[in-house]
Amino acid sequence: MSALTSQPTSSGSSEKIPRLRGWRAKAAGVVLAALALTTGVAAPAPAAANPYERGPDPTTASIEATSGSFATSTVTVSRLAVSGFGGGTIYYPTTTTAGTFGALSIAPGFTATQSSIAWLGPRLASQGFVVFTIDTLTTSDQPDSRGRQLLASLDYLTQQSSVRSRIDSTRLGVVGHSMGGGGTLEAARSRPTLQAAVPLTAWDLTKNWSTLQVPTLVVGAQSDTVAPVASHSIPFYTSLPSTLDRAYLELRGASHFAPNSPNTTIAKYTLSWLKRFIDNDTRYEQFLCPIPSTSLSISDYRGNCPHNG
C-alpha cells in the first residue's frame, strides 16, 4: 500500500489395568494372552494422525526458512478471465502424492498491486498451501470491496481454477496488507466458515470486530504512521471476541510497509497461524503458545493460550 492521505494426534486412549504383583501379574498375562489367541481380540489401534498435516515436523529453522519442503509452480490468472476481482498469481505445491492442500488468498493495499505481497506466495506454498496473490479491481478499492474480492478469489480458486483438484475447499484462509488487511477482516466477518485470517498492518475505518468468528492473527508495526497501531491494529485485536482464538503481534521498529518485502517474523508467525488453524496442525502450536516473548523483532505480543481450535 502506498501512503494514504486519510484513510488426533496419535494419542489414542487405552484402558488402564491396575498393576498386579508376583504370580497374580503372571497369571493375568497368561489369561489375557489366551483370550487374544482364542477370540482374535487385538489391542486397539492407535488413533490416526491428523490427516491435514503436510510436511515434516517443524522447527524454528524450518519456519524461518525462505522456502519449505515442497517444490512449487505458478499459474497466472488474467483479470479478463475472472469476475469479482482483478486476477492474480496462484502458487501451489507440485506434488500429487501428499493429498489436497489448504488454500488462501492474499490482497494488497491501497494503490498497490499483487507484486507488493508476492514474496509470500512461494514462501507459504512451499510449506504446503495453495496461495493466490490477487490484484484488485482498482488500486483504490476500499476495505469492504477488498474483502468481497478476497472471497470471490477463493471461490474462483476452489471452483474454477486449474488447480482446484489440489485444494480442500473446507480449509481456507485470507491474508492482506493495509487496506487488504482491512479486507481480510471484512472477509472473515462475512464468511465465518473460513479457518484463519491474518491482517498485516491493516487499515480500516471499522474498529469493532466483535462478531468475527474466524481465528485471527493481527499483525501491527510499532512505527506505523499510516495505520498507527493505537488506532488500527490494537483496537482491531481488542474488539475481537475474548473467546476467539486470536493474537496480536507487533513488529518492533517496523513501518507500515514492512509486509511489502521478505520479513522473517511476519513469515514465521503467519505460517504458524495458518498451519495451526487451516490445517489443524498442532505441531505448530509450540511457536504460538506460550505467548512469544518480546525481542529484537517483537515489541508486543498478546493472545489466548492454549488455543481452542
From Swiss-Prot:
Variation of activity with pH: Optimum pH is 8.0 with p-nitrophenyl palmitate (p-NPP) as substrate. At pH 7 and 9 displays around 90% of relative activity. Stable at pH range 6-9 retaining over 95% of relative activity after 24 hours. Stable even in acidic pH of 2-4 with more than 50% of residual activity after 24 hours.
Q: How is its activity regulated?
A: No effect on activity by SDS or chelating agents ethylenediaminetetraacetic acid (EDTA) or sodium citrate. No effect on activity by metal ions Ag(+), Ba(2+), Ca(2+), Co(2+), Cu(2+), Mn(2+), Ni(2+), Pb(2+) or Zn(2+). Activated by 1 mM digitonin and sodium deoxycholate, and reducing agents 1 mM 1,4-dithiothreitol, beta-mercaptoethanol and ascorbic acid. Activated by benzene, n-hexane, p-xylene and toluene. Activated by Fe(3+). Inhibited slightly by 1 mM of different chain length fatty acids, and only marginally by 6.0 M urea.
Key word Transferase present in the record? no
Biological process GO annotation list? Answer: medium-chain fatty acid catabolic process; triglyceride catabolic process
Instruction: Tell me which UniProt keywords the record has, alphabetically.
Output: Disulfide bond, Hydrolase, Lipid degradation, Lipid metabolism, Secreted, Serine esterase, Signal
Q: What reaction does this catalyse?
A: a carboxylic ester + H2O = an alcohol + a carboxylate + H(+); a triacylglycerol + H2O = a diacylglycerol + a fatty acid + H(+); 1,2,3-tri-(9Z-octadecenoyl)-glycerol + H2O = di-(9Z)-octadecenoylglycerol + (9Z)-octadecenoate + H(+); (6-hydroxyhexanoyl)(n) + H2O = (6-hydroxyhexanoyl)(n-1) + 6-hydroxyhexanoate + H(+)
GO MF annotations in UniProt: carboxylesterase activity; cutinase activity; triacylglycerol lipase activity
* Family to which this protein belongs: Belongs to the AB hydrolase superfamily.
Protein name, please?
A: Cutinase
Taxonomic lineage of the native organism: Bacteria, Bacillati, Actinomycetota, Actinomycetes, Pseudonocardiales
